[in-house]
Amino acid sequence: MSPLISAASVLAAGLAVGLASIGPGVGQGTAAGQALEGIARQPEAEGKIRGTLLLSFAFMESLTIYGLVVALALLFANPFVS
């Protein structure tokens, strides 16, 4: 294996995890803040807001997991190495 390909794969794996975590992290913070505001304004809708929030968290976390899968593929099942 070429050292250049190995180094580029490790760098790409780190970037995949890092960049895949930034968007969902910001989105989850924003969603949680808006959910708290909604519950404060309308306490009787707490159950529905919480259910929707947890479902949206699951979808946001799936993006991070996809980044992790790409990083693991680059590290352990590298398609650029023969």
Curated annotation (Swiss-Prot):
SUPFAM superfamilies per record: F1F0 ATP synthase subunit C
Residue intervals passing through the bilayer: 3-23, 57-77
Keyword Thylakoid: yes
Pfam families: ATP-synt_C
Keyword Secreted: no
Top-level taxon in the UniProt lineage: Eukaryota
InterPro entries: ATP_synth_csu_bac/chlpt (IPR005953), ATP_synth_F0_csu (IPR000454), ATP_synth_F0_csu_DDCD_BS (IPR020537), ATP_synth_F0_csu_sf (IPR038662), ATPase_proteolipid_c-like_dom (IPR002379), F/V-ATP_Csub_sf (IPR035921)
Subunit structure: F-type ATPases have 2 components, F(1) - the catalytic core - and F(0) - the membrane proton channel. F(1) has five subunits: alpha(3), beta(3), gamma(1), delta(1), epsilon(1). F(0) has four main subunits: a(1), b(1), b'(1) and c(10-14). The alpha and beta chains form an alternating ring which encloses part of the gamma chain. F(1) is attached to F(0) by a central stalk formed by the gamma and epsilon chains, while a peripheral stalk is formed by the delta, b and b' chains.
Function: F(1)F(0) ATP synthase produces ATP from ADP in the presence of a proton or sodium gradient. F-type ATPases consist of two structural domains, F(1) containing the extramembraneous catalytic core and F(0) containing the membrane proton channel, linked together by a central stalk and a peripheral stalk. During catalysis, ATP synthesis in the catalytic domain of F(1) is coupled via a rotary mechanism of the central stalk subunits to proton translocation. Key component of the F(0) channel; it plays a direct role in translocation across the membrane. A homomeric c-ring of between 10-14 subunits forms the central stalk rotor element with the F(1) delta and epsilon subunits.
Protein name in the entry: ATP synthase subunit c, chloroplastic
Lineage of origin: Eukaryota, Viridiplantae, Streptophyta, Mesostigmatophyceae, Mesostigmatales
Gene name of this polypeptide: atpH
